[in-house]
Amino acid sequence: MRNPLMQPWLTEKSTGLTEQKGQYVFKVKSAANKTEIKAAVEAKFGVDVASVRTVNCLGKTKRQFTRKGVLAGKKNDWKKAFITLKEGQAIDYYSGSTDQGEEKKSNKG
């Protein structure tokens, strides 16, 4: 798998984990495993990863009531990874995403 990291998961809860325990949360591809996630984080941000925990999140079921009846659907399932770094290290989300954005722009131009 090329790059299992999709985006950082920035919520109040994940920000609290970052400040208190030094854990970072990422939305990752569903097929990614812990070793691939660890290698991707270490390569992209240049940090040492102590541990990786993953959670499979189920997509919500949605219903829409119309004149023709009830239309049922489901959002996609996804995976969330909790990354714990070694003591004294930190990730700057914005520097990592800026580098990737510049690469995308240069490929188009």
Swiss-Prot record:
GO terms for molecular function: rRNA binding; structural constituent of ribosome. SUPFAM superfamilies: Ribosomal proteins S24e, L23 and L15e. Keywords: Ribonucleoprotein, Ribosomal protein, RNA-binding, rRNA-binding. Transmembrane segments: none annotated. InterPro entries: Nucleotide-bd_a/b_plait_sf, Ribosomal_uL23-like, Ribosomal_uL23/eL15/eS24_sf. GO terms for biological process: translation. GO terms for cellular component: ribonucleoprotein complex; ribosome. Pfam families: Ribosomal_L23. Part of the 50S ribosomal subunit. Contacts protein L29, and trigger factor when it is bound to the ribosome. HAMAP family: Ribosomal_uL23_B. One of the early assembly proteins it binds 23S rRNA. One of the proteins that surrounds the polypeptide exit tunnel on the outside of the ribosome. Forms the main docking site for trigger factor binding to the ribosome. NCBIfam families: PRK05738.1-3, PRK05738.2-4. Belongs to the universal ribosomal protein uL23 family. This is Large ribosomal subunit protein uL23. It comes from Prosthecochloris aestuarii (strain DSM 271 / SK 413). The lineage of its organism: Bacteria, Pseudomonadati, Chlorobiota, Chlorobiia, Chlorobiales.
